[in-house]
From Swiss-Prot:
Pfam families membership: Peptidase_C12
Protein name per the record: Ubiquitin carboxyl-terminal hydrolase YUH1
Principal EC category: hydrolase
Temperature section of the record: Optimum temperature is 27 degrees Celsius.
One Gene Ontology term of the molecular function aspect: cysteine-type deubiquitinase activity
Family statement drawn from the similarity comment of this UniProt entry: Belongs to the peptidase C12 family.
Gene it is expressed from: YUH1
Superkingdom of the organism of origin: Eukaryota
Region (Interaction with ubiquitin): 10-15, 149-157, 219-228
EC code: 3.4.19.12
Active site feature: C90, H166
């Protein structure tokens, strides 16, 4: 992938597509992605696989979002963050953020497991994966899985197409809740301390409030463009 053509087809917000890609990277078969239709309605939450280990949000970017990407972590938590270096690859980075911060879900010796272990002594104290080695790893993943990007139920756009839809990830790490966005050059965003009474990530009020803020700030025509995926036990 040349410097002039560092772009991929955007991944469809589809649990099967995300799960297939994650399994290729090393996610154990006992875990999978699934649709989340609400963070607050009990009747919809009751049918979700639990515990939820990560939440991926697809949302339309507006001017408010563009101006808020300078926020950064203000704590020493060991959350892992990848800088996005490939256009339209935010779905892949959402998967990387989900899995890298839940390494117990990875098969030992898998591609991502091996990469993270190889970097454990060389990455910075803030676990910022934004170096040349990381970039090459991501490019290799894309090369080996190029067909996966265009799978799904909808017609795939061109890799170089401009889109206003973007994926970010929420995880809990060492008692903190984080928003991970590869395009936020300041790194991971620390939302605050996790609620110790919550059974998993989907019950964390900080996540609910943050997602709600995106929906409230969206233009009326963009409200239907939101989607959420959760990472949890594979019920199939």
């Amino acid at each position: 992938m040349s410097g002039e053509n560092r772009a991929v087809v955007p991944i469809e917000s589809n649990p099967e597509v995300f799960t297939n890609f994650a399994h290729k990277l090393g996610l154990k078969n006992e875990w999978a992605y699934f649709d989340i239709y609400s963070l607050t309605e009990p009747e919809l939450l009751a049918f979700l696989p639990r515990p939820v280990k990560a939440i991926v949000l697809l949302f339309p970017i507006n001017e408010d979002r563009k101006s808020s990407t300078s926020q950064q972590i203000t704590s020493s938590y060991d959350v892992i963050w990848f800088k996005q270096s490939v256009k339209n690859a935010c779905g892949l980075y959402a998967i990387l953020h989900s899995l890298s911060n839940n390494q117990s879900l990875l098969e030992p010796g898998s591609d991502l497991d091996n990469f993270l272990k190889s970097q454990s002594d060389t990455s910075s104290s803030k676990n910022r994966f934004d170096d040349v080695t990381t970039d090459q790893f991501v490019l290799n993943v894309i090369k080996e899985n190029v067909q996966t990007f265009s799978t799904g139920q909808s017609e795939a756009p061109e890799a170089t197409a401009d889109t206003n839809l973007h994926y970010i990830t929420y995880v809990e790490e060492n008692g903190g809740i984080f928003e991970l966005d590869g395009r936020n050059l300041s790194g991971p965003l620390y939302l605050g301390k996790s609620d110790p009474t919550a059974t998993d990530l989907i019950e964390q009020e900080l996540v609910r409030v943050r997602v709600a803020s995106y929906m409230e700030n969206a233009n009326e025509e963009d409200v239907l463009n939101f989607a959420m995926l959760g990472l949890g036990p594979n019920w199939e």
